Curated annotation (Swiss-Prot):
GO terms for biological process: chromosome condensation. Pfam families: Bac_DNA_binding. This is DNA-binding protein HU-1. The modification Phosphothreonine is found at residue 4. Gene3D superfamilies: IHF-like DNA-binding proteins. GO terms for cellular component: cytosol. Homodimer. The lineage of its organism: Bacteria, Bacillati, Bacillota, Bacilli, Bacillales.
Length: 90
């Protein structure tokens, strides 16, 4: 399912227009992204948790030259599924 299909499903199930459903879906995504950008986690009980994880600096290799390079530490968004979501998928 892509974003357009998600908006269509939300519109059908809530009797909203596709435009309104699209605004709701986009707003939810924006709020999650803004919270993560501020360093907060988003906990949706039964669904899962969105959080920012830090990846430590590490050594790597340039595959073309074999030269060892330093890879800087980074922050990356992560999602961990909740129990209800895991059970629904089984």
């Amino acid at each position: 399912m892509n974003k357009t299909e998600l908006i269509h499903q939300v519109a059908e199930r809530t009797q909203m227009s596709k435009k309104d459903a699209g605004e709701v879906v986009n707003t939810v995504f924006d709020v999650i992204a803004e919270s993560l950008a501020q360093g907060d986690s988003v906990q949706l009980i039964g669904f899962g948790n969105f959080e920012v994880r830090e990846r430590a600096a590490r050594k790597g290799r340039n595959p073309q030259t074999g030269e060892e390079i330093d890879i800087a530490a980074t922050k990356t968004p992560a999602f961990k599924a909740g129990k209800q979501l895991k059970d629904a998928v089984k």
